[in-house]
From Swiss-Prot:
One of its GO terms (biological process) is UTP biosynthetic process. GO terms for molecular function: ATP binding; metal ion binding; nucleoside diphosphate kinase activity. It comes from the Archaea. The gene is ndk. This is Nucleoside diphosphate kinase. Its main location: cytoplasm. InterPro entries: NDK-like_dom, NDK-like_dom_sf, Nucleoside_diP_kinase, Nucleoside_diP_kinase_AS. It is found in: Cytoplasm. It comes from Thermoplasma acidophilum (strain ATCC 25905 / DSM 1728 / JCM 9062 / NBRC 15155 / AMRC-C165).
Length: 148
């Protein structure tokens, strides 16, 4: 089933020049970028995005971190996109993530963990409008007929 997922490359990914390498990994798995922005997340966006964590002790630090520098926000599309990206991302705690996953290869711990990915269709429905208008999602097809 084709579905969409929101992916954020967090400030540590941007500052460490990992954008291209991470997007390549996602595309190499057959996921298609249908929206992409390089942006500075506002405090309001961060608080809305992480609203499920509002009552947790780390909420304030999470908002401070995610707004500490630019991010890359993107919508990816493909078969089982949510599951595929979650597997590629690896464990939330980078120190426990398996080698070969994005966090396993690039993250040092749980706080600066490189990437966010929607964990369910419901999460995507909440998260996507924080970063994109529906009109910013681009429907397109691969040009395989031109290449092959």
């Amino acid at each position: 089933m084709t579905e969409r997922t929101l992916v954020l490359l967090k400030p540590d990914a941007v500052k460490r020049r990992l954008i291209g390498r991470i997007i390549s990994r996602l595309e190499d798995k057959g996921l298609k970028v249908v929206a992409l922005k390089f942006m500075q997340m506002t405090k309001d966006q961060a608080e809305n995005h992480y609203s499920v964590h509002r009552s947790k002790p780390f909420f304030k630090d999470l908002v401070t971190y995610i707004t500490s520098g630019p991010i890359v926000a993107m919508v990816l599309e493909g078969p089982k996109a949510i599951e595929v990206v979650r597997i590629l991302a690896g464990s939330t705690d980078g120190s426990k993530a398996q080698p070969g996953t994005i966090r396993g290869d690039f993250s040092m711990g749980i706080e600066k963990n490189i990437i966010h990915a929607s964990d369910s269709p419901e999460a995507y429905s909440h998260e996507m409008p924080i970063f994109f208008n529906e009109s910013e999602i681009v429907e397109w097809s691969y040009g395989d007929e031109i290449i092959y």
